[in-house]
UniProtKB/Swiss-Prot annotation:
GO cellular component term, pick one: cytosol
Residues annotated for Mg(2+) binding in this entry: 537, 539, 542
Reaction catalysed by this enzyme: acetate + ATP + CoA = acetyl-CoA + AMP + diphosphate
Binding site for CoA: 189-192, 311, 335, 523, 584
Gene name of the encoded protein: acsA
GO molecular function: acetate-CoA ligase activity; AMP binding; ATP binding; metal ion binding
Family note: Belongs to the ATP-dependent AMP-binding enzyme family.
Full protein name: Acetyl-coenzyme A synthetase
Superkingdom classification of source: Bacteria
Cofactor: Mg(2+)
InterPro entries to which the protein is assigned, alphabetical: Ac_CoA_lig, ACAS_N, AMP-bd_C, AMP-bd_C_sf, AMP-binding_CS, AMP-dep_synth/lig_dom, ANL_N_sf
Record function comment: Catalyzes the conversion of acetate into acetyl-CoA (AcCoA), an essential intermediate at the junction of anabolic and catabolic pathways. AcsA undergoes a two-step reaction. In the first half reaction, AcsA combines acetate with ATP to form acetyl-adenylate (AcAMP) intermediate. In the second half reaction, it can then transfer the acetyl group from AcAMP to the sulfhydryl group of CoA, forming the product AcCoA.
Residue positions where N6-acetyllysine is found in the record: 609
Enzyme class: ligase
Amino acid sequence: MDVKTYPVLEAAKNRTLVDNATYLKWYEESVADPEKFWGEHGKRIEWFEPYTTVKNTSFDGNVSIKWFEDGLTNVSYNCIDRHLKTHGEKTAIIWEGDNPYIDKRITYNELYDKVCRLANVLKKHGVEKGDRVTIYMPMVPEAAYAMLACARIGAIHSVVFGGFSPEALAGRIVDCESTFVITCDEGLRGGKPVPLKENTEKAIDIAARQHVMVNKVLVVRRTGGKVPWAPGRDVWYHQEIATVEPHCPPEKMRAEDPLFILYTSGSTGKPKGVLHTTGGYLVYASMTHQYVFDYHDGDIYWCTADVGWVTGHSYIVYGPLANAATTLMFEGVPNFPDAGRFWEVIDKHKVNIFYTAPTAIRSLMGAGDDFVNRSSRSSLRLLGTVGEPINPEAWEWYYHVVGAERSPIVDTWWQTETGGILITPLPGATDLKPGSATRPFFGVKPQIVDNEGNVIDGPADGNLCITDSWPGQMRTVYGDHERFIQTYFSTYKGKYFTGDGCRRDEDGYYWITGRVDDVLNVSGHRLGTAEVESALVSHHLVSEAAVVGYPHPIKGQGIYCYVSLMAGEVGSDELRQELVKHVRSEIGPIATPDKIQFAPGLPKTRSGKIMRRILRKIAEDDFGSLGDTSTLADPAVVDDLIANRQNRG
């Protein structure tokens, strides 16, 4: 296949922290002697007591991952206190509100004050080291304060995306037995209020029925809207922080003490609590932030993600603040008030580094070039993408139209589980190919295997594994180490299996081809097909459901649902709408089905397993090559699904 290559731009080459020769040298050192390499780079953060052990990891047997394990440090101290002498008056966070006329800047000195006060409020209400605190917030600075305050006192935060439903929030509260929730009266998205406190109330009731009692809710006032209130349990953030001291000593944390839990979708059942720890995570998040984005002091850096996702954790909060950067937090959406919003924000705040998702790029590309061209974007020098593979057409538009051919694009591949970027170009070192994540970051050892687990060398197409640990890697599934081993290390023994398909070309560049398990990637966010199926089946008229992904021009993957109804029930447009609403209320708007096809039967093997491969083909209108159907219990079901495929909406 003929692929255009874009050589490293002269401007990027001239200011880069890492040129190609340095990349090759460091990479070789990092995989040949990881102990020595990370022993050196672990010193990029400050330690109260230095580590003497660097790497103690095993991908075999009981799988154990430990980095810098005898060192003592604190993430909040590294993101704030250590910068105060030299960068105290520097802007730490630029907050751009949903309303284009509202913004504010928070300096590192102010950040220290806010985080210490909030840490003292947590302590006042009995939160101790190791306790789990749930954060269900919109994109406001207080969300970052809450994360850093937890880290300061050694509490473990579990941030839940503000777009998730009360049921999804409750599931996450119950799984980690969290008794303290931080939320807002309401969020604002695209000019519309989001009922966060009301959702929290419902979630607390659901959790209580499962014997997990939330005994304190700290509420940030964002809109001033009327919200349900439980005196004694609920307290206002603004009142509480006025009652405490503006200083709070950072807890000395072991490198392997938990920092946060973040729930992510799997191919089976309920979301997994991905557990990240303190030292290795911060070393990796800060190092990738510096070198992948070629961050120099004074750069204005904007990642458009939400703190409810791992990208927000690593590349809005922890990575940038550990590097004393100015990080922009955006409350709004790309198309409000119109599709020029991103580009206006770039001009307004003179953004140098811009990191967003292919979904947003595709949707803004569809809105036309005029919205882009009415801004200058002259401050931009680096573009990035994250969340899903970017199609070459969108890459080219991003490079030529948004970047005006002046900014390299770092197409970054990583996961909630990896803690930070694993495969990526480095702007001053890597020639670019549209659609390729290019080469591994330092210390990352990718391997492509076939379905039987045989290693394929050279140009290859197969399943992407990583053969050795890196400091940012998740340590376990919260409360379920067996599930951790089963999910990531049992498919290909002794290797971390990413769940992604991958192609490596003749230049050694990696091209991510998408999930190979039953996980959807919708608008850059992971969603398990099992989650959507169980939401559908919980509706009283549904007897069975199967969910697959199909190519979607904006979202990357759309959600296609095959639904079998209870005996005697008939599908209708009204029922279709009702099911869409039902799924949204069970999981959240992110899980909105794009197409629902009523199906009297589903294609199953004689052992009762649904043949999703066939369902995917029908969803994609590719039923000319269904492959081997000899194991089907009832082949007529497939003919019926094909004949009835117009019955989708």
